[in-house]
Amino acid sequence: MVGATTPAHAADLTAGYVALEMEPDARFPFISGIVEGIAQTRARIDGSETQTTGCIYHWFYEEEKSYDNILAAFAKFQDRAPGAIVDALIRRRCDA
């Protein structure tokens, strides 16, 4: 499979890799997938309460600098998991 992530490669998929080595056209879809996963998890946890999920979507898709802030955090914490960094930024912004 071309482009498949194997367990050996998954360990190398650090925030630094995403920020510095991943093809620029692949970064946004990859990061938006993380955001969508976190938002959907919050939606399941929160049930009919949609405030946190709405905050997540607003933060990522509508706030001007959210994507740039994510990339800056990835560059700063290069050895961390991308999902953990996005989750921390969401928790800080949306009190999730």
PLM feature spans:
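Bacterial N-terminal signal peptides
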Residues: 1-3
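Compact alpha-helical subdomains of small soluble proteins
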Residues: 12-17, 24-25, 40-96
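Globin-like tetrapyrrole-binding proteins
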Residues: 34
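Cell-wall glycan-active module
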Residues: 37
